[in-house]
Amino acid sequence: MIKAAVVGASGYIGGELVRLLAMHPEVEITAITSRRFAGQKVHKVHPNLRGLDLRFTNTKEFDADVIFLAVPHGTSMEIIDDYLGSAKIIDMSADFRLREDLYREYYGEHKRPELIEEFVYGLPELHRKEIRKAELVANPGCNATATILALYPFRELTDEAIVDLKVSSSAGGRRENVASIHPERSHVVRVYKPYHHRHEGEVIQETGVKAAFTVHSVDIIRGLLATIYFRFEGSTRELLRKLLVYKDEPFVRLVTDKGGLQRFPDPKYVIGSNFADIGFAHDEENSRAIVLSAIDNLIKGGSGQAVQNMNLMFGLDERTGLNYYPVYPV
């Protein structure tokens, strides 16, 4: 059994990670940590996990083969020395995703730049071989995951793209602020980052395409939809052929139906799963390609992708513990 510890397990990503690991046939959870909730049973913070015999601790010492750092951005680089060398590490924050120049542009000065190159960017569809050999993995951001998966097959067709993102309330995490209370959050379609979103750096790094994000908060609890536009004067057949690079990927589903309930990707149909649904449209009159990508931000955009990476790092089938379909209806 793989012994797993989750550092910072009180947030939404941490809670979903604990849920997935608890159901994983090859994993034993040895520790979940939280400074705020140390000593409390896990279901006091994550009520859906009632019956799971775990308590939060505030220790830095535990028996683990893999440690998940589910902590806020900027924290991992401060605590990484507590865990380096003791176990494989999967970092859920943004601290080690970007090369130093891009990190500086989007986040500021990095406190541990010498460690950046030791981390593998944890998007299995692009870096499966490197992840299998890795000791340190940086889990991608949710918006970056959806956008990179959609844009990567077309990276040779364009050097810039417009990315319109509709994201759920859980993408903002569990932080308490007035904008997140129900009277303020309900029924919104709120632009909260019109340009220079931090996840742009991940897209530039992984695809070479200059992606300009505009991000909207919408009135859903989980899930996100990326709609990507770029100039394209080729054929519809060429667009489809490019997407077929994913035909054997276990967690990418191509949505190309011409009729029925779902003609294009919709986050409603991936909730609770590790799937990314990708589709496209071709606006020939205006010489535009429109590529769409839907994921559950907490699973493929977070905890599920982390488990997928763990599976690869330990030589397991990457579908282990993740091979289930989305919840429906939601």
UniProtKB/Swiss-Prot annotation:
PANTHER family xref list? [LYSW]-L-2-AMINOADIPATE_[LYSW]-L-GLUTAMATE PHOSPHATE REDUCTASE-RELATED, N-ACETYL-GAMMA-GLUTAMYL-PHOSPHATE REDUCTASE, CHLOROPLASTIC-RELATED-RELATED
Tell me where in or outside the cell this protein is found. Cytoplasm
What name does the UniProt record give this protein?
Putative [LysW]-L-2-aminoadipate/[LysW]-L-glutamate phosphate reductase
What role is this protein assigned? Involved in both the arginine and lysine biosynthetic pathways.
> Would you tell me the Gene Ontology cellular component terms?
cytoplasm
Location, primary (coarse class):
cytoplasm
Alphabetic keyword roster = Amino-acid biosynthesis, Arginine biosynthesis, Cytoplasm, Lysine biosynthesis, NADP, Oxidoreductase
Q: Which residues cross the membrane?
A: none
- Which pathway does UniProt place it in? Amino-acid biosynthesis; L-lysine biosynthesis via AAA pathway; L-lysine from L-alpha-aminoadipate (Thermus route): step 3/5; Amino-acid biosynthesis; L-arginine biosynthesis
